[in-house]
């Protein structure tokens, strides 16, 4: 994970005190980052929740104090405005292992194989 923001520096105190944009395909519920932060007895303020990282990056350009925590391997595939800075996350977040499942009938399907390959490139 990395942090995107217009802020000029990033510390643990700044990270925890700043307003955050949360990204999730679900409308409600705890975000994966918050599960790990809560385990360390940290919390953050989610002021806005959206479903796409690209939308969150656009919002960051209009919210100078806002912060987005985003997987580094996703960020490299998105457009980043020039006024946004990238920092390492100042709190420890674990790596998250992702897996893919598909029906055995699709194993030899060339289109499905291509799609799996592209997904692996993004999330590897």
Q: What is each residue range found by the language model?
A:
Residues 2-4, 21, 69, 101:
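Structural motif
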Residues 3, 12, 84-124:
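A late-sequence structural motif
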Residues 4-6, 10-12, 17-40, 108-110, ...:
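Secondary-structure junction motif
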Residues 16-17, 64, 94-96:
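Residue-level preference for short coil/turn positions at secondary-structure junctions
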Residues 24-25, 48, 90, 104:
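Structured beta->alpha junctions
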Residues 26-85:
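Hydrophobic hinge/microswitch elements
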């Amino acid at each position: 994970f990395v942090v995107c923001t217009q802020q000029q520096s990033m510390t643990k105190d700044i990270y925890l005190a700043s307003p955050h944009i949360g990204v999730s395909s679900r409308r409600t519920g705890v975000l994966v980052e918050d599960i790990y932060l809560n385990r360390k007895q940290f919390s953050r303020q989610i002021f806005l929740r959206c479903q796409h990282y690209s939308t969150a990056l656009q919002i960051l350009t209009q919210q100078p104090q806002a912060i987005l925590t985003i997987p580094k391997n996703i960020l490299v595939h998105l457009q980043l405005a020039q006024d946004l800075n990238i920092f390492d996350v100042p709190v420890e977040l674990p790596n998250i292992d992702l897996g893919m499942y598909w029906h055995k009938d699709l194993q030899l399907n060339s289109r499905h194989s291509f799609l799996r390959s592209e997904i692996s490139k993004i999330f590897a």
